[in-house]
Amino acid sequence: MIRKRMSAYLTAGVACLAVPFGAHADNMDDLVAAAKAEGQLTVIALGHDWCGYGALVQSFKDKYGLTVNELSPTGGSGEELTTIKANIGNNGSQAPDVIDVGLVFGPIAQKEDLLQPYKVQTWEEIPATAKDPEGHWYGDYYGVLSFVVNKDVISKSPADWADLLDPAYRKSVSLPADPRTANNSILSVYAAGLATGAQPGAAAARAGLEFYRQLKDSGNLVSGFGSAASIAKGETPITTRWDSNGITYAENFRGNPPLDTIVPKSVTVAGVYAQAISKYAPHPHAAKLWMEYLYSDEGQLGYLKGLCHPIRFDAMRKSGIITDDMLTKLPATGDNLVFPELSHLVKAGEVIAKEWTSTVGAGSK
């Protein structure tokens, strides 16, 4: 198992490879003018309480005067790729210009020829381990997988993965979404497998599937997925979510109900998300401008305000743009945070998508 502190991961290999000029950052004045001529940007799966996207979208609109069409705000990464494919040749409002997907879905989309390359001006500050060298996709932020717990329902919060099997948590544990298509659920299963001591990759994926089978057989796994609403209602009182989700929900709920956001003691994973431009984007210049905005200091700080860890974190810390007082709301992770290798994630995602139904199925006992 590879364990790395955040800054060590983010400084690993920032050298970039040369690609044709057209894939590099455009002149900003020309890009802004071209984007304004298009007049619109279509995004997908950007919930307003996810990593500060509500404020980021509004700031982008205010800054550049573009209309932003928002599709399926609660959609998963797999749905984003499906939506691109379903709208090839459609230049209307249902065709996304850009996507924000779990890192494992970047290479999948590239392999399916759904993306066009583009390198933002801050390209060299994005770690080589979190980007395609040609610029088809690259990490934008990451979250730390945690347990989000409704304290009105659960008096003693779980501290680690094995605790979830406690009979006290009957009909209490949920995944955040469909693990066959959603990045946060794939990584929930994967992290549970790593916590058993399984080797990274397919072995950890299968160990995680077995763990969730045990949760189901014990009656602890509920059939529904853990949304903000279901957590608040007590329908999914223990849900695996990113740390940013739990903290944001707690702020929005204002103590009704009170929530705990707990980083598992033994092992947890960092979930890197990736931004990319659709090869079939109806508004390609607006898409490039959106990318430039997200990877600028302003955009990266927007992620941090939304309690997600920006991908340019290390460079921005070194330059003093990110200061200690900006990090006080983020839960401590210690040395138990794992940044999974992309090859392991790809294999794990394939195994979980293929074997979830046969191993775990759906619903509680």
Task: Please tell me what each predicted stretch does.
Residues 1-11:
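Bacterial N-terminal signal peptides that target proteins for export
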